Amino acid sequence: MDEAGFVQTQPNRSAWTETGEVHLITAARGKRLNVMAALISTGELFTAKFWETTTAALFGGFLGLLLESVGRPLTVILDNASIHKAKEIQPLLALLKEKGLTLYFLPPYSPELNRVEKLWHKMKYEWMAFKARNSAGLEADVDKFWTVSALIIE
């Protein structure tokens, strides 16, 4: 399980300038589409997307919906992001634990162990065209990958 953010304007990955000149990159930020995804052992991808900032409360809600959707005891493998361990959601996490949820935290700085990280990398750097988008275009581009993405993650 992991979170990622997608912005309307792609970041500059490289630039070209004459030797001795400074290349200035202006900081232009558009709206950010945040996505949470969990890869289920069946190969299904459970996702949620939202334009709001990713918070511990949204994370807790996502876990509740995930557990309800799967409908059986569930172990979620995740990183050590602060929203995953926030004090404000500890009562909710305790309740979800009683309902069959177990959280397994990966070692720090080990994104290669999180299979959903592979999805984010492919979406951001391989599949999505390097272009500016409006909000609707960004959401449509992110949506079109959900149907094939679970098959790609290995």
Regions found by a protein language model. Name each.
Residues 1-154:
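Short functional hotspots at interaction and active-site rims
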